[in-house]
Amino acid sequence: MTPQLILASTSVFRQALLQKLGLAFGSCNPDIDESPMTNESAQDLVLRLAKAKAKAGATHFPHGLIIGSDQVAVIDGKIIGKPLNRENAIKQLSQASGKVITFYTGLALYDAKTGEVTAQVEPFTVHFRQLTAAQIVAYVDKEQPFYCAGSFKSEGLGIALFTRLEGRDPNTLIGLPLILLTEMLLNHGIDVLAD
């Protein structure tokens, strides 16, 4: 019997991405402390948090196959996450203007029944165009990207902020690397292309 697939996230963006695969799934709020540890790298942080989110979902779904994901960006060597408000979003985009920024998305798949966890970090690089203060304010006011790492929604108007995108899977930038996820699911006997 195939275990129940669970997305340990309340993100509407991640839920919409997972729906693209046409699989039945549930979701839950992982409710974990997302604070970085002292001197923790961006890659280690997102990997740890993705695993923690997936494992937290097992509390509600002890026989589930649980997906956890986390994303941060690195600007000038500093880890940034969700801005949470207008002022921080404007600040983040001002810092990113004209720069090349790497986003790191951690993805974990946890089999709550066996305790097996598979996890990996998927990088994605974004080349920001040189933005004026007026463009940044206008963008933030239009899309209000307060709950998106890096303060933009690449699936919407945010695409106008960039000159180039580099990575294996554009879904990674939205928060859920679907190519990597389909590979992980296949290793658990779930083929998204099967009838």
UniProtKB/Swiss-Prot annotation:
Coiled coil: none annotated. The active site is at 70 (proton acceptor). InterPro entries: ITPase-like_fam, Maf-like. Its cofactor is a divalent metal cation. GO terms for biological process: nucleotide metabolic process. It holds the Pfam family Maf. Its main location: cytoplasm. One of its GO terms (cellular component) is cytoplasm. GO terms for molecular function: nucleoside triphosphate diphosphatase activity. It is found in: Cytoplasm. NCBIfam families: maf (TIGR00172). Belongs to the Maf family. YceF subfamily. Nucleoside triphosphate pyrophosphatase that hydrolyzes 7-methyl-GTP (m(7)GTP). May have a dual role in cell division arrest and in preventing the incorporation of modified nucleotides into cellular nucleic acids. This is 7-methyl-GTP pyrophosphatase. It comes from Shewanella sp. (strain MR-4). The lineage of its organism: Bacteria, Pseudomonadati, Pseudomonadota, Gammaproteobacteria, Alteromonadales.
